[in-house]
């Protein structure tokens, strides 16, 4: 059904101040695909997916993300390098310029919503300069029924104009690109960047303020799935730690792969209606769900084709390492109807520790869970340039600091209370290195990580012996089905045990240094979850 024909007459952007625009409203995925190809802005890949290039920006630009400092946000947002304040007057002037820029142009408008739980539904209208940006929002946000559109009232608006360039000297931005949230006007304003993830993370950031402040609901940067008995599992983790991979389990139904809410009514729900997956080095063997989802309707970003073909070379990172695909969650077979589950029974914190110190699986106390949640640790492998092989620690509070407007301890307190009330087991999973740090040891085998998670989910680790790690104090199981017991204690996998002890203390000191800025806000239980540093 061509909704454009049905509803174009009733959609006006005058309320937004965009005048005389040619509005292409609620186009189907096929129509947006065709327009993008016809305009020369994209190419159809051999699988039927649409491939586009996002331009100069192939990732988010955290230094150019702002929140308008107003009566709603002034006393609640944790202002600083993550949440950078923007003056209401400056926003008004910049928004007026964007409105004038989009007036008298063809624009693509989509009505959608976020939050799959009907009690928390938030209607979002998206106004984009390009058809492919609109396709991204069709894929990623939830899609209302045609019957809902006649009476659709947007609560938030996303305005995305990639070819509008700000003037930093006049507009108060850092450079020509920007992503700004205004909680009074309820607008996410994006310009100067074609990276589609700015739209997704803009609304995620808005929900990360709205839900805890007004709805007593914990927003989470996590994936989630449900077992045959209705038991929900949640996987927190930064990019590259295995959220998408480990939540894709043939024995369990996927709720979602990235953004969820945990309500006071004991439900866990997906914010989104799609998946936004990395495709670097993608193979059907390692990631069958993602690989098979790259078909008609999917949107590939910044990939390269094999010479002379329209077949994607997933190993080619000549444009960026952050090659991506978005697709509706319905492209995956094994999904949870309605994208809602009940209270989780197990929570997994995923870290790719390339120092090789943390155990592959350990059980956390409530205090340790809060400490590690606030820390949000993983480690990046340094680039090979100039012979640098030493891993770099990466701490991102709540496993998603760039998207969290409130102080991290606010989210941690909510999580701690919910974990205690629901009697949740919390596990720290190291998907990183074993037998030494990066360069000496090896990456933990995926089959072992999967076996450990399966054992935890099935209750097979409830009655085994545990020994506390001497530095981090976390409880290491001494046995696990289908996993060699020698890898469960990381110290035993190192040839040089003294070096392991030294490096473990060094990592603990990195944790302590990072946590210093949170100490004054943390209670005694959380502080007791810290590692020993001497």
UniProtKB/Swiss-Prot annotation:
Binds 1 Mn(2+) ion per subunit. Pathway: Carbohydrate biosynthesis; gluconeogenesis. SUPFAM superfamilies: PEP carboxykinase N-terminal domain (SSF68923), PEP carboxykinase-like (SSF53795). It catalyses: oxaloacetate + ATP = phosphoenolpyruvate + ADP + CO2. Substrate binds at residues 60, 195, 201, 324. Mn(2+) binds at residues 201, 221, 258. Keywords: ATP-binding, Cytoplasm, Decarboxylase, Gluconeogenesis, Lyase, Manganese, Metal-binding, Nucleotide-binding. Its EC number is 4.1.1.49. ATP binds at residues 201, 221, 237-245, 287, 324, 449. The keyword Lipid biosynthesis does not apply. Involved in the gluconeogenesis. Catalyzes the conversion of oxaloacetate (OAA) to phosphoenolpyruvate (PEP) through direct phosphoryl transfer between the nucleoside triphosphate and OAA. This is Phosphoenolpyruvate carboxykinase (ATP). It comes from Flavobacterium johnsoniae (strain ATCC 17061 / DSM 2064 / JCM 8514 / BCRC 14874 / CCUG 350202 / NBRC 14942 / NCIMB 11054 / UW101).
């Amino acid at each position: 059904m061509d909704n454009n024909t049905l509803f174009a007459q009733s959609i006006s952007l005058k309320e937004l101040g965009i005048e005389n625009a040619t509005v292409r409203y609620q186009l189907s995925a096929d129509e947006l695909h065709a327009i993008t190809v016809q305009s020369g802005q994209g190419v159809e890949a051999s699988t039927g997916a649409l491939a586009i290039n996002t331009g100069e920006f192939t990732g988010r630009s955290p230094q150019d993300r702002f929140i308008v400092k107003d009566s709603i946000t002034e006393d609640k947002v944790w202002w600083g390098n993550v949440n950078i304040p923007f003056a209401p007057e400056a926003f008004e002037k910049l928004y007026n310029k964007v409105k004038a820029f989009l007036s008298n142009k063809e624009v693509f408008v989509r009505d959608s919503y976020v939050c799959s739980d009907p009690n928390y539904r938030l209607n979002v209208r998206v106004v984009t300069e390009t058809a492919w940006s609109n396709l991204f929002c069709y894929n990623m946000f939830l899609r209302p029924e045609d019957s809902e559109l006649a009476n659709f009232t947007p609560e938030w608006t996303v305005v995305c104009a990639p070819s509008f360039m700000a003037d930093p000297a006049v507009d108060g931005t850092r450079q020509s690109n920007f992503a700004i949230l205004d909680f009074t006007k309820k607008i996410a304003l994006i310009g100067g960047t074609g990276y589609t993830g700015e739209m997704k993370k803009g609304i995620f950031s808005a929900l990360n303020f709205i839900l805890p402040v007004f709805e007593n609901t914990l927003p989470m940067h996590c994936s989630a799935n449900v077992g045959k008995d209705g038991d929900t599992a949640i996987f927190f983790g930064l990019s590259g730690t295995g959220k998408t991979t480990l939540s894709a389990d043939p024995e369990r139904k996927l709720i979602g792969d990235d953004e969820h809410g945990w309500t006071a009514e004991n439900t866990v729900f997906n914010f989104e209606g799609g998946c936004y997956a990395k495709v670097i080095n993608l193979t059907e063997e390692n990631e069958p769900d993602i690989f098979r989802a790259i078909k008609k309707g999917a949107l590939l970003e910044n990939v390269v084709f094999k010479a002379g073909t329209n077949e994607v070379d997933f190993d080619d990172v000549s444009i960026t390492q952050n090659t991506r695909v978005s697709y509706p969650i319905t492209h995956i077979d094994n999904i949870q109807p309605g994208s809602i589950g009940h209270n989780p029974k197990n929570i997994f914190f995923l870290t790719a520790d390339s120092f090789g110190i943390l155990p592959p699986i350990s059980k956390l106390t409530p205090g340790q869970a809060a400490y590690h949640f606030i820390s949000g640790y993983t480690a990046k492998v340094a680039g090979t340039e100039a012979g640098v092989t030493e891993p770099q620690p990466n701490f991102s509070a709540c496993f998603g600091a760039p998207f969290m407007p409130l102080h991290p301890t606010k989210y941690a307190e909510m999580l701690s209370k919910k974990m205690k009330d629901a009697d949740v087991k919390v596990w720290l999973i190291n998907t990183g290195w074993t037998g030494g740090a990066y360069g000496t040891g090896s990456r933990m085998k995926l089959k072992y990580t999967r076996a450990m998670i399966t054992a935890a989910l099935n209750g097979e680790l409830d009655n085994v012996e545990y020994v506390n790690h001497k530095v981090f104090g976390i409880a290491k199981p001494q046995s696990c089905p289908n996993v060699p017991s020698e890898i469960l204690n990381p110290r035993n996998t190192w040839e040089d045990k003294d070096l392991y002890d030294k490096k473990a203390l060094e990592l603990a000191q990195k944790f302590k240094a990072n946590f210093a800025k949170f100490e004054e806000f943390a209670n005694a239980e959380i502080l007791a979850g810290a590692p020993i540093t001497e």
